[in-house]
Amino acid sequence: MKRLASLLLASALALTAAGCAGQNPAASTQSGPPEAVESGKSSVAYVEELRIGTTAAIDGANVMTENGIFGKLNYNAVVTAPFVVTDENGKVQPFFMTGWELSGDLNTITATFATDQGLTWHDGEPVTMDDVVFTFQYLIDRKSSYCSGLTGVEAVNETTATLTLTDGKAFTMLNSMANFVTLRPEHVWSKVEGEYAEYTGEDAAIGCGPYKLTGVDEEAQSMTLEAVSDTYMGQELTVRKLTVRTYDSHDALVMALRSGEVDAM
């Protein structure tokens, strides 16, 4: 199921109707802009709703755990902002972490972040360096395998922080982080007592990514996410809404795909 990570990140940033794995263009609702937008020699197709089927149960939404629907299908990749991502060649590229320099011993990363681009959390609060420091400190405290060797984080100014590591693991950490380690809101989680993974408040799904959670129906086993705007960090969002529906079995899911009930699985 982790293959959806690349599908959803593509959906968030540059998905076209023809480029979606398993999509049935005739079944998709493409009632966004009336005409495709020319981009060089190719045109971008807008999709009003991309319907995704899964067999994973929709059991709440919490960006701090990989055990729920967000973690299992990596919806964190579109609800929150990954620090770094990988391109089609598997090479690490900047995202919310907009650039970095490594020390000679590979024990220090001096990184810049998109905290000056006017991004806000889905509840309207501004994204700041406090969120960056909070997120990395959380990963340190939890001894996250994605950030193995990370021992410290310190803000230098409003857009820059230094990350301290051991054993020259800078390259290893950047590769491990790609697509999976995302920014978390300090103003939400610093107030939560107990295990973050067990928190079920309405703000548990708040992110600053290109899509925000707008509805969860556990009884109907469906979930909807909507684009926050037409563009995100300078890139067009060609899919307006993501609808996720859970099916009881793989056979039922395949039938739904074949009948055009869903566009991807």
Predicted features along the sequence, with ranges:
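Short, low-complexity disordered leader/linker segments with a strong preference
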Residues: 1-50, 91, 152
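Aromatic- and charge-enriched surface segment that lines or borders ligand/interaction sites
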Residues: 99-142, 156, 162
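Gly/Pro-rich hinge or "lid" segments in bacterial periplasmic/extracellular proteins
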Residues: 88, 179-237
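N-terminal lobe/hinge region of extracytoplasmic solute-binding protein
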Residues: 51-104, 206
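Short, well-ordered beta-strand elements
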Residues: 46-56, 108-113, 135, 161-163, ...
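Surface-exposed binding/hinge segments that line
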Residues: 112, 147-190
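Ligand-site clamp/hinge motif
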Residues: 230-265
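Short, solvent-exposed loop/turn elements at domain surfaces
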Residues: 46, 58-66, 91-93, 171-174, ...
